[in-house]
């Protein structure tokens, strides 16, 4: 598992992980209310739903979260996949951001971005286009796949780990991620995400694993 090994997600019954920062830490860009709903209600609901779906499935209870995602994807169990993937996606997202983050990175990740996108500015343009262009609910991701960085988007609960990709960064573009503070202005939210929220240390740690 990527960074999520530290989140109490590795075995049934799954537990809502604590945020790695205070809910108020993203002011003035986000209010604590956004995190109270996003983490405390939406993410928590996926955790509880997953536990309820697994309560009579002893074989699945022996699997870790990534194994459950893989099993439910292969067996087309949509309910289990959706909730398991959303538990994983959200925990990964919480580590993808940090207070006073964003801006231009340095080190190996910047070198790789320049190699694969031409420049950091071009990466930002492409990432913003993919994140804002996702129709309806979903996610925008920076992944490492086929020996290069790629930007991909997934609809609803879709996750790159179900397709053999290594996720480095996640941007949640479900409306519950930004609607309290930004209403229908997803482009503004994505712009704030890039400029003020990305945890580049986390991204680089995932790249160098």
From Swiss-Prot:
Domain of life: Bacteria
Entry cofactors: Mn(2+); Fe(3+)
Catalytic function, reaction form: 2 superoxide + 2 H(+) = H2O2 + O2
UniProt keyword Iron, yes or no: yes
Entry's EC annotation: 1.15.1.1
Annotated residues for binding of Fe(3+): 38, 90, 172, 176
The keyword Manganese is assigned to this record: yes
Protein family membership: Belongs to the iron/manganese superoxide dismutase family.
Function (record text): Destroys superoxide anion radicals which are normally produced within the cells and which are toxic to biological systems. Catalyzes the dismutation of superoxide anion radicals into O2 and H2O2 by successive reduction and oxidation of the transition metal ion at the active site.
Protein's recorded name: Superoxide dismutase [Mn/Fe]
